[in-house]
Amino acid sequence: MCIIGAGKYSNSNCLVKVRDRNYVPAIKIIRELVNGVEVAYLYDIDTDWSEGVNEYGIGVVSSALRVIDDEVVKKEKSRADDGIRIRKILAHDNVSCAVNEAVRNGMSGHCFISDPNQNITFEPQPEDGNHWIKFLDLKN
């Protein structure tokens, strides 16, 4: 199970994640332009999973709701759809557009999307096809 969090550290927004898998992932750190936006992200070579930050300070971390599905993706050497979705989220220059990208393309798990001023939690509701979005107040 993966655990994600959003909070403040030294008066700056920060995102954290513990990525716990039943396998040893093959990970690369990639820095590239995505639709003209500079991004740096963690990339799981076997599953295409990605999480990272862009030049505008927009960051994304995500936790799969159904870990068993992720384990199957690794075992079968197939690709998870959320990797490309997260890279598309990171290709935006403002957090509102990034959240709209997440809503438009969907995500399979709970994620935090953050910029220097805001932290947003986003979670799909598969039973009704809707999304739960909340702007977090982390001033204290």
Give short role names for the model-derived ranges:
Residues 1-140:
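N-terminal nucleophile
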